[in-house]
Amino acid sequence: MFVTEAYAQSAPTVGETHTETPAVGQPQPEATHTETGVAHGAEHGASGVFPPFDQSTYASQVLWLAITFGLFYLLMQKVIVPRVGGILENRHGRIAQDLDEAARLKAEADTAVETYEKELAAARAKASSIGASARDAAKAKADADRAAIEAGLAEKLAAAEKRIAGIRDHAFADVGAIAEETATAIVDQLVGAKVKDTDVKAAIAAASAVKGA
């Protein structure tokens, strides 16, 4: 417990002995009491007041409160606040770094998606071009093959027609010879005279002309 200066001056010194001088005719006291007992009695007399509510110690309480608050303020300012500030600053820096990294990764992802879309569009265009080229090539080949087949068929048809015409001419020639021989034989049988070949051929030719007309 803290004591004030007035209380210290008014209180007797601990350990100081006090000897009472007996009056004339009084017996000598057997023992002297010390100031320690007086102080002890004073403490017992003041023990009924709760120390924080003791008005005699308000000044010392305020002083120690100010000292304690000052020390706590210095502790907060020099130790706790810098540590908390450092932690917050580090966390803020880490968050900012994470945000920058996330932005960088997002930009890379966007670039990759854009590149993929461009490559996909180019691949589709190339596939379409290849398909169109293949269709054009197939059509051209089909047209060429058809033209070649048609030309071959036309050539074969012309050859066949020529052959048929030759066979027909040959057949007609044979028929003419047979007709001449037959006509000569018939005339010989009917008339009994030999007919000239020129006359028979002329008659057959005239008959053929009339039949064809």
UniProtKB/Swiss-Prot annotation:
Subunit comment: F-type ATPases have 2 components, F(1) - the catalytic core - and F(0) - the membrane proton channel. F(1) has five subunits: alpha(3), beta(3), gamma(1), delta(1), epsilon(1). F(0) has three main subunits: a(1), b(2) and c(10-14). The alpha and beta chains form an alternating ring which encloses part of the gamma chain. F(1) is attached to F(0) by a central stalk formed by the gamma and epsilon chains, while a peripheral stalk is formed by the delta and b chains.
Protein's UniProt name: ATP synthase subunit b 2
One function term, GO molecular function aspect: proton-transporting ATPase activity, rotational mechanism
InterPro entries: ATP_synth_b/b'su_bac/chlpt, ATP_synthase_B_chain
Chief site of localization: membrane
A Pfam match: ATP-synt_B
PANTHER family: ATP SYNTHASE SUBUNIT B (PTHR33445:SF1), ATP SYNTHASE SUBUNIT B', CHLOROPLASTIC (PTHR33445)
Membrane topology category: Single-pass membrane protein
One cellular component (GO) term of this entry: proton-transporting ATP synthase complex
